[in-house]
């Protein structure tokens, strides 16, 4: 499990009929000081309105996550059993991924108590110490844990890392599969996604996919955003031979990383051709520069491109951040209304976006802007 949510301590707290709230067990021992527990105990053994709810509290540079449980029955002292099995992490840790684990453990212990008085019986309750020890070690080591409680009960737990929100898929973005396309043609996806999958080829942009698949644009964007979330696709810009690219510092990884070399050469070699050489591919990437279009690259390096598919060369470079696109952004420098559509000429909208929104081709847009003295082009 990532260090961002490493568990420093697991504790079991309960309400004692005479002593009140107390920590019965903790692993490692004495991790939670008396001062810390006194500060947070009202959130560990709580009032009824907070029971059976996930609670995260930060105090004294520690973050405690728990789910206080209350089981009411006349067999218990004061007619209720109150307990909490929780985790302690660093105050700065991102603990969202641990919350479902804490909630699930609270549910398991509640079930075990209702079925066999596991928590309220001293003999069985003592089994919590080795259980907590295994939990701490295995969740920190691998993010998953299997806990045999008794002959008929086993608990399976897994930390599901929270993925960041994917970027918004714009109509001018081009989705590219991150793995073999054929792996994803199955019924695990919703109907909209199944309908657009055949049109994702790494070259069609979102708007074109929408038109050719006959699916409403916003539905296509939502479906692609879902694929982005699960890492099935990534986004690159529209490929045209007038595009300009330049290498990033990561292009050096192509020399140092053997697995990246293998993936790159397999990806960019023309179908049915002899395998491309690393020397040729690296030279092609390094030949990209401001002012050099893809068309220029093809004209200057026919020998190196004998076995290299230039479209896949660009595509792979963008996917792996070996290269980046330099895009043109029109900026209107006066209020002349002839600069229509003026709202798109602010320096914030690329040629890709403007062409998708207006239906103009790159050539048409270029001709229009070249003849407009009130427009300058910013490359970035």
From Swiss-Prot:
Signal peptide: none
Keyword check for Oxidoreductase: no
The record's note on its domains: The arginine finger is critical for the GTPase-activating mechanism.
Covalent link Glycyl lysine isopeptide (Lys-Gly) (interchain with G-Cter in ubiquitin), residues: 158, 357
List of residues binding GDP: 78
Organism: Bos taurus
Subunit structure, as described in the record: Within the GATOR complex, component of the GATOR1 subcomplex, made of DEPDC5, NPRL2 and NPRL3. GATOR1 mediates the strong interaction of the GATOR complex with small GTPases Rag (RagA/RRAGA, RagB/RRAGB, RagC/RRAGC and/or RagD/RRAGD) heterodimers. GATOR1 interacts with GPR155/LYCHOS; interaction takes place in presence of cholesterol and prevents interaction between GATOR1 and KICSTOR. Interacts with PDPK1.
Keyword Kinase: no
Protein name: GATOR1 complex protein NPRL2
Modified residues (Asymmetric dimethylarginine): 78
GO BP, one annotated term: positive regulation of autophagy
Protein encoded by which gene: NPRL2
Positions bearing the site annotation: Arginine finger: 124
Family as reported in the entry's similarity comment: Belongs to the NPR2 family.
Keyword field: GTPase activation, Isopeptide bond, Lysosome, Membrane, Methylation, Tumor suppressor, Ubl conjugation
Region (Interaction with PDPK1): 1-133
Cellular location(s): Lysosome membrane
Post-translational modification: In the presence of abundant amino acids, ubiquitinated at Lys-158 and Lys-357 via 'Lys-6'-linked ubiquitination by the WDR24 component of the GATOR2 complex, thereby inhibiting the GATOR1 complex and promoting mTORC1 activation. Asymmetric dimethylation at Arg-78 by PRMT1 inhibits the GTPase activator activity of the GATOR1 complex and consequently inducing timely mTORC1 activation under methionine-sufficient conditions.
Pfam families tied to this protein: NPR2
Top-level taxon of origin: Eukaryota
Function: Catalytic component of the GATOR1 complex, a multiprotein complex that functions as an inhibitor of the amino acid-sensing branch of the mTORC1 pathway. In response to amino acid depletion, the GATOR1 complex has GTPase activating protein (GAP) activity and strongly increases GTP hydrolysis by RagA/RRAGA (or RagB/RRAGB) within heterodimeric Rag complexes, thereby turning them into their inactive GDP-bound form, releasing mTORC1 from lysosomal surface and inhibiting mTORC1 signaling. In the presence of abundant amino acids, the GATOR1 complex is ubiquitinated and inhibited by GATOR2. Suppresses Src-dependent tyrosine phosphorylation and activation of PDPK1 and its downstream signaling. Down-regulates PDPK1 kinase activity by interfering with tyrosine phosphorylation at 'Tyr-9', 'Tyr-373' and 'Tyr-376' residues. May act as a tumor suppressor. Suppresses cell growth and enhances sensitivity to various anticancer drugs.
GO annotations of cellular component type: GATOR1 complex; lysosomal membrane; vacuolar membrane
């Amino acid at each position: 499990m990532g260090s961002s949510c490493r568990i420093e301590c697991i504790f079991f707290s309960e309400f004692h009929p005479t002593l009140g709230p107390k920590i019965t067990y903790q692993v490692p021992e004495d991790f939670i000081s008396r001062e810390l527990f006194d500060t947070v105990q009202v959130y560990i053994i709580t009032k009824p309105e907070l029971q059976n709810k996930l609670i995260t509290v930060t105090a004294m540079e520690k973050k405690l996550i728990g789910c206080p449980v209350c089981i009411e029955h006349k067999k218990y002292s004061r007619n209720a059993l109150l307990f909490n099995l929780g985790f302690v992490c660093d105050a700065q840790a991102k603990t969202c991924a641990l919350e479902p684990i804490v909630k699930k453990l609270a549910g398991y212990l509640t079930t075990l108590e209702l079925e066999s008085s596991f928590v309220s019986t001293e003999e069985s309750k003592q089994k919590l110490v080795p259980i907590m020890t295994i939990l701490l070690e295995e969740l920190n080591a691998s993010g998953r844990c299997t806990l045999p409680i008794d002959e008929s009960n086993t608990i399976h737990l897994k930390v599901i890392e929270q993925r960041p929100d994917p970027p918004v898929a714009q109509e001018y973005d081009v989705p590219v599969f991150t793995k073999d396309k054929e792996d994803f043609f199955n019924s695990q996806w919703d109907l909209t996604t199944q309908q657009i999958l055949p049109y994702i080829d790494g070259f069609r942009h979102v708007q074109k996919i929408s038109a050719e698949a006959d699916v409403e644009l916003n539905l296509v964007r939502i479906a692609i955003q879902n694929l982005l979330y699960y890492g099935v696709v990534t986004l690159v810009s529209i490929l045209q031979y007038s595009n300009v690219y330049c290498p990033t510092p990561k292009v050096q990884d192509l020399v140092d990383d053997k697995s990246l070399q293998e993936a790159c050469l397999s990806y960019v070699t023309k179908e049915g051709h002899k395998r491309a050489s690393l020397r040729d591919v690296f030279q092609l990437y390094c030949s990209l520069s401001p002012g050099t279009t893809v068309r220029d690259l093809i004209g200057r390096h026919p020998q190196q491109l004998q076995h290299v598919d230039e479209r896949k060369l660009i595509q792979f470079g963008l996917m792996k951040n070996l290269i980046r696109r330099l895009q043109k952004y029109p900026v209107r420098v006066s209020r002349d209304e002839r600069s229509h559509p003026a709202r798109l000429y602010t320096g914030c909208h690329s040629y890709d976006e403007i062409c998708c929104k207006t239906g103009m081709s790159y050539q048409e847009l270029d001709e229009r802007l070249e003849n407009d003295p009130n427009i300058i082009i910013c490359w970035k």
